[in-house]
Amino acid sequence: MNFSYYPGCTLKNKAQELDRCARASLEKLGVTLRELDEWQCCGGAFSMATDEIASKLASVRALAAARDRGEDLVTLCSACHNVLKQTNDAMANHQEFSDHANNYMKLETPYRGETKVIHYLELLRDVVGFDNVKKAVVNPLKGKKVGAYYGCLLLRPGKIMQMDNPENPTIMEDFLRAIGAEPVVYANRNECCGGYAVMEDRAIAQKKSTAVMNNAADMQAEMLVTACPLCQYNLTKNSAAETQLPVYYFTELLAEALGVKD
């Protein structure tokens, strides 16, 4: 099975383990990720201004490239997934935005939202199947109590992302069970870590990330996993929690369970 793949900027520098473990794991599971040629930064955040076109053109270009290959587009970084998914929705359902974007792009074939954008976790759940992931595990993570941290961008806005219930998600907990770990459910797992506020007011990010960390520790989690490099940064660098849990990318645990982590 082949899928086009948009890694995003951070996975090429600060979050290389998220990318490397993802590729190795899917190879073991019989899925090939074909990285897009000459992709560009998605912008990192989806502007809610309806007349803001320029910042979204790189995402449109990536979506059109996957369409031209005839492949679904897989994403991994929560922020990239959010931007690409919302841009795709705008191209499919908002005529004025789509017309303006296509006018700028001057593509041979105008893009109208034809590409299906799926997150890596959705690929594991809906294409590979968590049962097949479980069958491929050679190093089950038994005894590891892991808290899944969703954050804001992976699930919201729910009507567009359509990955899981944004208020009571289960996809990461089901993933953790498939690799043999014990998922720990805690209230703040889909609350904001502080996000980009860290660039303007670190105190906000510290307050938010500390609340997440304390809540997970209180519920007896031994570690956290996330799909978001920014969340991983805030939880690791800005939390002032008394108990500082280690924070891993979910693909690191997947690669360990499948026996493909160096």
Name each model-derived stretch.
Residues 1-262:
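Iron-sulfur cluster-binding electron-transfer modules in prokaryotic oxidoreductases
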